[in-house]
Regions:
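Short, well-ordered, aromatic-rich surface patches in folded extracellular/luminal domains
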Residues: 46-167
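Short C-terminal domain-edge/linker segments immediately following a structured domain
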Residues: 16-20, 33, 92-95
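Generic alpha-helical scaffold signal
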Residues: 24-27, 55
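A short, structured beta-strand/loop element
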Residues: 2-11, 55-59
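Charged, amphipathic alpha-helical segments
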Residues: 27-50
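Acidic/histidine-rich, surface-exposed loop or edge segments in extracytoplasmic proteins
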Residues: 8-21, 121-123, 138-139
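Short amphipathic beta-strand/extended segments with alternating polar/hydrophobic composition
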Residues: 1-5, 21-25, 68-79
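A mature extracytoplasmic/lumenal domain signature
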Residues: 5-7, 15, 29, 37, ...
Length: 167
């Protein structure tokens, strides 16, 4: 995941992925993320906690300030609240990308699965786990306006469109 200070982001499943998801965060979302980085002194402050916990993989945060300074923080577990919040933001971005990929897939290949996928997306949306929600509007409009999808999926898509547009 790469994020620039103007809110442009790129999500890749693999480092050499040919077609990553490029998206733009809303200004308020971008501001929150970069304020967290600032609170962590540009990732210079130690955030690693050596408490024995299950190994779930290294989490690596990198910050390039643009003036040649590059900081990196690698950890498995942290108790630093700002680092946890920052990690949560990146997990939310990945979760949002996965929702969009799955929704686009079922719209194209599994019309009967659209309502279930929309329900999962709506659950994440209700729990404030979705970022860059405006990127979902084209596929939601496609579902809401296409009679080939079941009525409940069209109604759910229309309700989600209304909620996203009112944000």
């Amino acid at each position: 995941m790469e994020l620039t200070s103007d809110g442009n982001a790129i999500y890749r499943e693999e480092p050499d992925e040919e077609d990553p998801w490029a998206f733009t965060l809303r200004p308020r979302e971008t501001k929150v993320i970069f304020e967290l980085v600032k609170k962590l002194d540009g990732l210079r402050r130690p955030i690693r906690n050596d408490r024995k916990v299950a190994f779930t993989g290294d989490k690596i945060l990198r910050y390039d300030s643009g003036n040649g300074q590059r900081e990196e923080a690698a950890y498995v577990y942290t108790e630093e609240p700002d680092a946890k919040t920052l990690e949560s933001w990146f997990l939310r971005m990945a979760e949002s990308a996965n929702h969009l990929f799955e929704l686009e897939r079922v719209v194209r290949f599994d019309r009967l699965g659209v309502n279930k996928t929309l329900l999962y997306f709506q659950t994440s949306f209700d729990k404030n786990r979705v970022v860059a929600s405006h990127h979902f509007l084209p596929v939601l409009r496609k579902v809401a306006g296409d009679q080939r999808f079941v009525h409940i999926a069209r109604a759910r898509a229309a309700a989600l469109i209304e909620r996203i547009e009112s944000e």
